[in-house]
């Protein structure tokens, strides 16, 4: 478990992180989102012990990061955006070197390295120089070093940046596999990745925690209204007449041109996020207007992110 209480980080007169609090539990993958300059990187550096907070407290399984840093850091595995690799070492040499730095007992070192290689599927590359590895496998080696010692908390900063689509899928699957045994914090600018991989999402803006919850919870909270795309066989006056009696509808737009199948493309905007597809279908059926298709446009995590950061983006701080 990692907990932050009223964390503040200032650089001179500039406040990068402003009274940030959170409590993260093992067994979940947390997505950490924020626009450039939101204070995200500064917060992650404090979580991992690279920076000390100006005030406030960060504890790892009850150990204070400032008062007992060695014990607190022993629970953390960290993959920075650019993995700290040595190109002239083989994969195995590098992992054994990191295992020694982490003070893993020499008798356990070989088994720990083998376990990390197995989890990240790099065992067949153990004798290869790191300089000869692809970007995807370099990321795997970086993740393997984070897993050495089986730390309870895994912190990943932009783990799929620069990877090709197949490599991205492989790394995401690997991250998902860590969930049962670890607490995983994933920082990413790729909102679809966070939505797909993470159990909960934290959104930070101007150094403050603006939202935390599951993607579904945040999408429901910020839904506001719903939009429906409907293909209908009929004429514009008939459609508008049928829908005019529904109190939940705010606006109806009808395309000027019919589709190839002769249907009208109708966009319906409602006053709330409540699902009224059944009411729409009944209203159209009551005047014998066939509905070929009806889809509800869902609120996306991207929509939530833009709304949350936009409400705070009023000439505030530029944080790191």
Identify the residue ranges that each predicted region occupies.
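Non-catalytic surface loops within mature trypsin-like serine protease
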Residues: 26, 124, 232-234, 270-272, ...
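ABC transporter nucleotide-binding domains
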Residues: 2-4, 9-211
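C-terminal coupling/interaction segments
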Residues: 269-320
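ABC transporter nucleotide-binding domain
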Residues: 173-186, 190-271
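A short linear hydrophobic-aromatic micro-motif
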Residues: 121, 250-255, 290-295
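Solvent-exposed beta-strand sheet faces enriched in polar/charged residues
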Residues: 5, 231, 255, 295-297
């Amino acid at each position: 478990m990692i907990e932050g209480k009223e964390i503040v980080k200032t650089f001179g007169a500039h406040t990068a992180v402003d009274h940030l609090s959170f409590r993260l539990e093992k067994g979940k993958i947390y997505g950490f989102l924020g626009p450039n300059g939101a204070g995200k990187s500064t917060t992650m550096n404090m979580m991992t012990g690279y920076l000390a907070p100006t005030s406030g407290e960060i504890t790892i399984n009850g150990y204070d990061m400032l008062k007992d840093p060695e014990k607190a850091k022993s629970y953390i595995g960290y993959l920075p955006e650019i993995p700290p690799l040595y190109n002239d070492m083989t994969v195995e040499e590098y992992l054994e070197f990191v295992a020694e730095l982490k003070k893993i007992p020499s008798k356990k070192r070989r088994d720990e390295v083998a376990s990390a290689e197995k989890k990240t599927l790099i065992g067949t590359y153990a004798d290869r120089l790191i300089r000869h590895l692809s970007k995807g496998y370099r990321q795997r080696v970086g993740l393997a070093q984070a897993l050495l010692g089986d730390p309870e908390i895994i912190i990943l900063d932009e783990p799929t940046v620069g990877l090709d689509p197949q490599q991205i899928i492989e790394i995401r699957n690997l991250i998902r596999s860590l969930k049962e045994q670890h607490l995983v914090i994933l920082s990413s600018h790729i909102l679809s990745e966070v939505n797909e991989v993470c159990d909960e999402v934290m959104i930070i803006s101007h150094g403050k925690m603006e939202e935390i919850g599951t993607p579904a919870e945040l999408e429901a909270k910020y839904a506001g209204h719903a939009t429906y795309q409907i293909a209908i066989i009929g004429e514009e006056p008939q459609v508008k007449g049928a829908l005019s009696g529904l109190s939940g509808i705010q606006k109806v737009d009808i395309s000027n041109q019919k589709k190839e199948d002769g249907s009208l493309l109708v966009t319906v905007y409602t006053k709330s996020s409540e699902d009224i597809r059944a009411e729409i279908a009944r209203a159209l059926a009551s005047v014998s207007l066939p509905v070929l298709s009806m889809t509800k446009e869902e609120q996306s995590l991207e929509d939530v992110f833009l709304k949350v950061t936009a409400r705070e983006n009023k000439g505030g701080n530029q944080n790191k």
